[in-house]
């Protein structure tokens, strides 16, 4: 899980979701997991 000031989709499978007021990117590729922090 990467923590970044701005998150964006890296590939077509990535999904942007809101979790507890935080924006996160989930993907089948674990390297693409990001959270805004």
Curated annotation (Swiss-Prot):
One of its GO terms (cellular component) is ribonucleoprotein complex. One of its GO terms (molecular function) is structural constituent of ribosome. The keyword Transferase does not apply. It comes from the Bacteria. One of its GO terms (biological process) is translation. The keyword Transmembrane does not apply. InterPro entries: Ribosomal_bL36, Ribosomal_bL36_sp. Keywords: Ribonucleoprotein, Ribosomal protein. Belongs to the bacterial ribosomal protein bL36 family. NCBIfam families: rpmJ_bact. This is Large ribosomal subunit protein bL36. It comes from Tropheryma whipplei (strain Twist).
């Amino acid at each position: 899980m990467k923590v970044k000031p701005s998150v964006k989709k890296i590939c077509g499978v990535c999904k942007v979701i809101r979790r507890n007021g935080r924006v996160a990117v989930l993907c089948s590729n674990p390297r693409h997991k990001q959270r805004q922090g």
